[in-house]
Amino acid sequence: MPVDLKITTELLYKGALVFALMDAIYIPVLIWRVSQETFRRLKWPSVIAAALVWYGIWAWAIGKFWETVYSYVFPAWAQTWVPWIAFVVAGSVALGLWMLAIRIKWNFILTFCLMGGVIGSLTHLWAVQRGIVTKPPMLQGASPLAAVVIAFFEYIFYWCTILALAKIMSWLQMKLKII
């Protein structure tokens, strides 16, 4: 990562637009391809997929951006433990999202993915409070609102991906008769 890279408000909003456009394609495809019956079978595959995806995201992010971003907002021990914490927390969150989605009298895919987006915005509100847009030089001057907005659409994309992976895992399990 170039030391002089600057994440600006404009870049965050452009990123939000890109994620929103991808979400606008991803969600209808999931609604088309994942029936309510199938979604009910995705309880544990979504937990496993979420744990693995979020472990991977955080292992990559901490590995790539520890010095330039995360060392400014996390304690030193987080460099080792955040990916593992994400593994456990994401699995638990996936279970909660799945339970919420099957209980709400609304589209289960939209509930699962949009609530994932809300969680993203909440985590970025926390990051803003910790100084994510004021402490790291590469983010100084970026709008806190833009950081929260991009998180909403970015996390919808991640939770759509988790749901797609869960469906693939479930399909493979049925085809290969695993467990």
List where the protein language model places each region.
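Aromatic-rich, lipid-facing transmembrane alpha helices and their immediate juxtamembrane interface loops
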Residues: M1-I179
